[in-house]
Amino acid sequence: MKSNQERSNECLPPKKREIPATSRPSEEKATALPSDNHCVEGVAWLPSTPGIRGHGGGRHGSAGTSGEHGLQGMGLHKALSAGLDYSPPSAPRSVPTANTLPTVYPPPQSGTPVSPVQYAHLSHTFQFIGSSQYSGPYAGFIPSQLISPSGNPVTSAVASAAGATTPSQRSQLEAYSTLLANMGSLSQAPGHKVEPPPQQHLSRAAGLVNPGSPPPPTQQNQYIHISSSPQSSGRATSPPPIPVHLHPHQTMIPHTLTLGPSSQVVVQYSDAGGHFVPRESTKKAESSRLQQAMQAKEVLNGEMEKSRRYGASSSVELSLGKASSKSVPHPYESRHVVVHPSPADYSSRDTSGVRGSVMVLPNSSTPSADLEAQQTTHREASPSTLNDKSGLHLGKPGHRSYALSPHTVIQTTHSASEPLPVGLPATAFYAGTQPPVIGYLSGQQQAITYAGGLPQHLVIPGNQPLLIPVGSPDMDTPGAASAIVTSSPQFAAVPHTFVTTALPKSENFNPEALVTQAAYPAMVQAQIHLPVVQSVASPTTASPTLPPYFMKGSIIQLANGELKKVEDLKTEDFIQSAEISNDLKIDSSTVERIEESHSPGVAVIQFAVGEHRAQVSVEVLVEYPFFVFGQGWSSCCPERTSQLFDLPCSKLSVGDVCISLTLKNLKNGSVKKGQPVDPASVLLKQAKTDSLAGSRHRYAEQENGINQGSAQVLSENGELKFPEKIGLPAAPFLSKIEPSKPTATRKRRWSAPETRKLEKSEDEPPLTLPKPSLIPQEVKICIEGRSNVGK
């Protein structure tokens, strides 16, 4: 006859039925009876193990079948329990009923291949601190990575095999980690802390680390502190975060954050395809070699090899310390992982905190309006005001990095389509056109002094990165900071380099490190390693008045449509262009005197222009190139010209005949364009007014109309002030003006018949000697006092 308990058990639904202890296999019996306090959990979880399906069905037909049907009804727990099974720990704790689990944990995708069931005994030090209502679900879903490798030999096998997990198995691990991470967002309490066994460490696998000796027995407490935004914030983490355990040495974390015998810290590292396996602490020598190897790989032509070291990640969250998050959306996510050596590397006298790199990026789930509101709300006063003048958006990254305070974030524009140096497109890091925050400043939490007197600084990457020191004005050069860090053995154990955006080839990367303080109350400080670029002055920046077409490789279009490089131009090109073109003619000027000007880098050249050899003196930069008949490009200072333009040229000397192509039908005559390269407009004018396009158009026989202000152009040409020394090649800019002719004045288009007649008459002289033209007296005088009229 059935007892009352059996009858009541049959009346219950299958999922709530209880299998008698006497009808279970012996292996389940031993596992289910560690203590009376876990009776409820044993009832909830043991029916879902594959052992029930394998043994219970044969030995106890009805009970096993009903238990299996109940297992199928538990849709939320089917894949999870089948993938990995854990026996309850021996430590007593409060456990909620099993019916609360479906509301807390979402199930993974059905049909996921599962790995064999392994039993792992949790150590007695594995405790749950925080809200009691969430303690139980943690126990059932602790992934194998958090289980002590020394607790059970079976667990060690699981840990060793975790490095070769398949994608399906990895999805289970990600699901478990998501459960742990999402639990922190269900309450506004100071966060839930999970204390794994002392030997537990999480790190990247695949050759990055080597297992070493276990840590000293004194290191008993370690935490994975899950600090996430409250559920009301509505922020959805697209990739599942995987907890990464940082080393909880007491010198690495502010003591104000310690809630137990040791400090707690967590890094949630979302890996889109990567996985983490537990490892034991490495030896001091191995850790030192690991750090050196990572530092060597960190910078490769200024690019971070992140994809190879940490996997191609799509999102990373760095949460350090206190979980005092407010119910506000967090618009930023930090995108880096901090690497810590083993505790053996830190002696009692070495209190330097660990240094890590942080890259804060906008959260794609946060609207742009909320982002702006966050930037305004979290705007800081001290270092931020320094950058507000330049229009940068500054603000805290949504209270994400709690231990790193105070800090300033620098937001710079970055094209979302531009590939980043980590090997992923920009859209893999942030969505749309929302620019990332790629600067980070670690400030002082207490009275902290930086070892070596390193100043705080901000680095704004870009085409010309800007380094802004903040505080400690005694040191101006950040390069000294890097030297101090690398040369000091105190910080040799924690080297780290961080490079953000792709920068020009000419940049020299000089990583700047914010060294943590030597004082005992050490805090975790983010080390900003950003490139400092030594920009090479281009010719346009060095002397803005010089035309860019003098640069080597510039393409010049001849009158016949042929394209030539500026360094390949020859005298025949000038002559041929003058013959073909209806608008252009060759003008020549003879150098009579070259003197240095009162201004540095400027030369005064006196030319004899035209048939009457009118004397015209012009101030010109020493590197300005002229085209000399039968010789090519020449300047007063060929070395300077070659340095700025990479244009090979000769030394300009007295007696050289400079030729240029000029317009025939200018109002007051044609201004001689000393530059054969660019067309009909005066080279000097181009240099001063930057009218290169117009001159090129005229040179290419485009009918843009004759410039009526050519006389002023000539004046401006003679007025050119180039801050260069004599000796640079200058293009023939000598301006020649032929007597004004009424027909030329009336007819402004190249098709005018009078212009054609003039062209024939002017082309009659032999090609070997260009026909000179006269400069009117008025034009000479209007060279703004810089021209000396010949007697």
Curated annotation (Swiss-Prot):
Basic and acidic residues composition bias: residue spans: 1-30
Changes seen on gene knockout: Mice with conditional knockouts of either ATXN1-ATXN1L or CIC in the developing forebrain exhibit intellectual disability, hyperactivity, social-behavioral deficits and reduced thickness of upper cortical layers.
Record key words, sorted: Cytoplasm, DNA-binding, Isopeptide bond, Nucleus, Phosphoprotein, Repressor, RNA-binding, Transcription, Transcription regulation, Ubl conjugation
Residues bearing PTM Phosphothreonine: T218
Alphabetical GO biological process terms: adult locomotory behavior; brain development; excitatory postsynaptic potential; insulin-like growth factor receptor signaling pathway; learning; lung alveolus development; memory; negative regulation of DNA-templated transcription
Cross-link Glycyl lysine isopeptide (Lys-Gly) (interchain with G-Cter in SUMO) residue location(s): K16, K193, K585, K672, K721
Tissues expressing the protein: Expressed in the cortex and hypothalamus (at protein level). Widely expressed. In brain, the pattern of distribution is limited to neuron populations.
Misc: Different transgenic mouse, containing a poly-Gln region insertion in position 199 have been developed to replicate phenotypes of the spinocerebellar ataxia 1 disease (SCA1) in human. Heterozygous mice with a poly-Gln of 92 residues [92Q] develop the ataxia typical of human SCA1. However, they show only the phenotype associated with dysfunctional Purkinje cells and usually live a normal lifespan.
Record function comment: Chromatin-binding factor that repress Notch signaling in the absence of Notch intracellular domain by acting as a CBF1 corepressor. Binds to the HEY promoter and might assist, along with NCOR2, RBPJ-mediated repression. May be involved in RNA metabolism. In concert with CIC and ATXN1L, involved in brain development.
Protein name per UniProt: Ataxin-1
